[in-house]
Amino acid sequence: MKKSLFLLMLTASLGAYAANHEVKMLDNGKDGSMVFEPGYVNAKVSDTVTFKAANKGHWVQSKALPDGVADFLSEDGKDFTLKLDKEGVYVYTCPPHRMMNMSGVIQVGKPVNKAKAQAVVDELENRAMQSKGRLKKYMQQVK
């Protein structure tokens, strides 16, 4: 009984250290129009990121992920929470506003897939018609 209670308390306490990071999907923000705010998040394994649909017409889709992480795609205009189970760099975008460079970066622990993520960022930047350099700026924060 004591062992079971100890394990239950230990498991409950582990979740207490996980943080939730909120990223707003906005028509206008500090970094311009059609933007995720913040555009760069530094998180730990077991944290979550909640994408808040602050304005209609936005959703989030993965573009680069650490090995073993499943692709994700949220629904239009709905909040979406992503559990960060693996270290690495997560690059995501808003599909209808991809050409406006509405994309962002999450770093979880060590950037084990940085080269792969950088290649995706370079491709997204090359295709952007507006706000060029914004995603590159977020990626430069990955250390």
Predicted regions span which residues?
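N-terminal signal peptide c-region/cleavage motif recognized by signal peptidases
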Residues: 13-15
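Extracytoplasmic copper-binding redox domains, predominantly the cupredoxin/blue-copper superfamily
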Residues: 17-143
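Sec-dependent N-terminal signal peptides
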Residues: 7-8
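Positively charged n-region of N-terminal signal peptides that target proteins for export
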Residues: 1-4
